[in-house]
Regions:
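Chalcogenol-based redox active-site neighborhoods
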Residues: 1-131
Length: 131
């Protein structure tokens, strides 16, 4: 059976939906907690993966650059809070990648094990997730 459903993906500059979530930095109300700032809301597929780790380390290294631009990063993935915290601790304490080490990730990482926020943001499409 053919599915002709059209999925509208979020675009740069569009207003993001509001949500409340638990993060590695405590609870947030998005976007109101970051009022007056540019916001980059991004997702990654899984904690502890090599590519995601290198990307997070790069973001961590660039933290001051984002602050100078009045820009707040917020990450979201399907992993839980305990996994996020362990991964960020591993990045800070154990990973040395291309001369980057001791990188502390200071932006919040949303706990979305239920995939509610990823679907709300159209990062995942719930009709394509097997139950």
């Amino acid at each position: 059976m053919e599915n002709n459903e059209v999925i509208i993906m979020p675009r740069i500059g569009e207003k993001a939906p509001e949500f409340q979530a638990n993060t590695t930095q405590g609870p947030i109300n998005f976007p109101s907690d970051f009022s007056g700032k540019w916001k980059i809301l991004f997702s990654h597929p899984a904690d502890f993966t090599p590519v995601c780790t290198s990307e997070f380390m790069t973001f961590g290294k660039m933290a001051e650059d984002f602050e100078k631009l009045n820009c707040q990063l917020v990450g979201v993935s399907i992993d839980g809070l305990h996994s996020h915290i362990a991964w960020l601790r591993t990045i800070k304490e154990k990973i040395d990648w291309k001369g980057l080490k001791n990188i502390e990730i200071k932006f919040p990482l949303v706990d979305d094990i239920s995939i509610v926020f990823l679907c709300l943001l159209s990062f995942l499409v719930s009709t394509h997730i097997s139950e």
